[in-house]
C-alpha cells in the first residue's frame, strides 16, 4: 500500500537540509522566508547569537493597509521591498537567502527579486 506523503513534512525536511549547508553570520545574516495560506513572513537572522535583526510580514498595519490581498504575488513583492528597506536602515546589505524549503517560484521568487531590486545583495 502506498503511503500518503505529507507536504509540510517534506518541506520541513528540505528546510533542514538547506539549513545544514549555511547559517547566518553577523557579516552576512540569513533572510528566512515563511509563507502560510494567508500571509508571508520574512526575517533577517544572525544565527551565531540567535537574534532576529529585522522582520516584516503581511500582518503589519502599514503593509496590510496598502494590499488588496495578503497572500498573492504582489503582496510578496511588497514584503520584499519592505524587508530590504528595513535591512538597509540597519546597515545590512548582504544576506544569505533561505527559502524555507519552499520551491523558488511564485511568491518566494517575487519576494527575493523585490528585495534584490530594493538593494539587498544575495
UniProtKB/Swiss-Prot annotation:
Q: Which SUPFAM superfamilies match?
A: Translational machinery components
Q: Does the keyword Ribonucleoprotein apply?
A: yes
**What Pfam families has UniProt attached to this entry?**
Ribosomal_L18p
Recall the GO molecular function terms of this protein's record. Answer: 5S rRNA binding; structural constituent of ribosome
Could you tell me which CDD domains the record lists for this protein?
A: Ribosomal_L18_L5e
Q: What does this protein do?
A: This is one of the proteins that bind and probably mediate the attachment of the 5S RNA into the large ribosomal subunit, where it forms part of the central protuberance.
The record's similarity note reads: Belongs to the universal ribosomal protein uL18 family.
Q: What is this protein called?
A: Large ribosomal subunit protein uL18
Q: Which organism is it from?
A: Lachnoclostridium phytofermentans (strain ATCC 700394 / DSM 18823 / ISDg)
